[in-house]
């Protein structure tokens, strides 16, 4: 589920994918894991 690099902002289901280090962010702040 990757439509764009900006989708991570409100993504919770795909958070795990972007959380690998592709984008800067903090778990629970910028994205959450289901």
UniProtKB/Swiss-Prot annotation:
Coiled coil: none annotated. GO terms for biological process: cellulose catabolic process. Its EC number is 3.2.1.4. GO terms for molecular function: cellulase activity. Keywords: Carbohydrate metabolism, Cellulose degradation, Glycosidase, Hydrolase, Polysaccharide degradation. It comes from the Eukaryota. It catalyses: Endohydrolysis of (1->4)-beta-D-glucosidic linkages in cellulose, lichenin and cereal beta-D-glucans. Active towards carboxymethyl cellulose and 4-methylumbelliferyl cellobioside. This is Endoglucanase 1. It comes from Sclerotinia sclerotiorum (White mold). The lineage of its organism: Eukaryota, Fungi, Dikarya, Ascomycota, Pezizomycotina.
């Amino acid at each position: 589920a990757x439509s764009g690099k900006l989708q991570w902002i409100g993504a919770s289901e795909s958070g795990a994918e972007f959380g690998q280090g592709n984008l800067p962010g903090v778990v629970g702040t910028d994205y959450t894991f289901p």
